[in-house]
């Protein structure tokens, strides 16, 4: 059986490193477990480290910069970072316009769609527009 491709957005990748006050932590980390078992192939976009780092530095956690650097190094070791192609960015712009998304959120959806992957997200707009699935739903699908 081949691994299921899963693109994780920053809302999911953040849970791999930070749990206080976060939802779906166990499910997000469950995707990592399935990755280690080679049941899924996890990928993030090249913009994910910026989003995760910013959330840790400027968000609720207020994590010191030296620890954010450690997290970003760990993220780079966990899974590949994908750079969207020009075509995928074009699709992202169309999705952003159609669904009222930010371009960077739409980029996750466009890359996942173009590459035949599932998008793991906790972003309300992506979920409401059917562009991604919660980590718990993806784990459920995997059985």
Each PLM stretch: what is its role?
Residues 1-5, 82, 109-143:
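Acidic, PIN/NYN-like endoribonuclease modules and their adjacent C-terminal/linker elements
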Residues 12-13, 48, 88, 108, ...:
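Alpha-helix capping/helix-boundary segments
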Residues 25-29, 49, 53, 68-72, ...:
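A general structural signal for well-ordered alpha-helical segments in protein cores
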Residues 51-79:
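Active-site-proximal, substrate-binding regions of enzyme catalytic domains
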